[in-house]
A protein has these predicted regions:
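Residue-level detector of anion-binding/catalytic polar loops
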Residues: 74-76, 139
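N-terminal flexible segment immediately upstream of the FAD-binding catalytic core
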Residues: 1-68, 85-116, 168
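Glycine-rich, histidine-containing beta strand-loop boundary motifs that form or position
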Residues: 25, 79-83, 102, 122, ...
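Short, basic and Ser/Thr-rich N-terminal targeting/leader segments
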Residues: 48, 71-73, 80, 150, ...
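FAD-binding subdomain of flavoenzyme oxidoreductases
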Residues: 106-191
Length: 191
């Protein structure tokens, strides 16, 4: 039997704390779509199922714990970061889904100029990363129109391309490795 919206919210609050669970109705409506349905957002006509909550993940452990809960409770999860996608991939397909927002995981953990690599979290803004690597005489080589606001998790998830992709390749050509959480075991592992 499916959990009620109230039960889902209470479960999430117990996992990540109340401050990290958004239940504001307007925010939930806007979280049911991405930029593909800009008309709906502008005119407030939302036709997609509304999620139960938006969870602001602050750590990989938050992601692990929320996915364990969702998998055990059979709740759909939509992962997002910068909310700039235009592919329809951020839309909720089932009512009372969980939108798992990684934008708070925004640390640049390491820049290695020698190997020309950076280790970043999913919520790092591409422009912020570009500004940091330029201090070392480097570039990300990735320049989509959403560069000022797009975040790494979404760029990788959508196989982003940009103005210099014919020279540097798409984002998938720039990723050396990543850590992912995989249900149903909900384990963290590098890929």
């Amino acid at each position: 039997m499916a959990l009620s919206k109230t039960a889902i919210v209470q479960g999430l609050q117990g996992i990540v704390g109340g401050a990290n669970v958004i239940t504001d109705e307007k925010e939930l409506q806007q979280s049911s779509i991405d930029r593909l349905r800009l008309y709906e957002d502008v005119h407030g006509v939302f036709t997609r199922p509304i999620p139960a909550a938006v969870v602001m993940a602050r750590s990989t452990q938050h992601v692990v714990d929320v996915l364990k809960y969702a998998n055990r409770s059979r709740i759909n999860v939509v992962a997002r970061t910068g909310r700039t996608a235009t592919e329809g991939g951020l839309e909720t397909a089932v009512a009372n889904s969980i939108v798992l927002d990684g934008s708070g995981m925004n640390g640049i953990l390491k820049i290695d100029p020698y190997n020309m690599q950076a280790t970043v979290q999913c919520g790092v803004c591409l422009q912020t990363l570009e500004d940091e690597v330029r201090k070392h005489g480097l570039t990300t080589g990735h320049s989509p129109q959403s560069k000022p606001i797009a975040q790494m998790g979404g760029l990788v998830a959508t196989r982003s391309i940009g103005q210099f992709s014919t020279l540097y390749g798409g984002i998938e050509d720039m990723v050396v490795g990543l850590e992912a959480v995989h249900p149903p075991r909900d384990e963290r592992r590098p890929l």
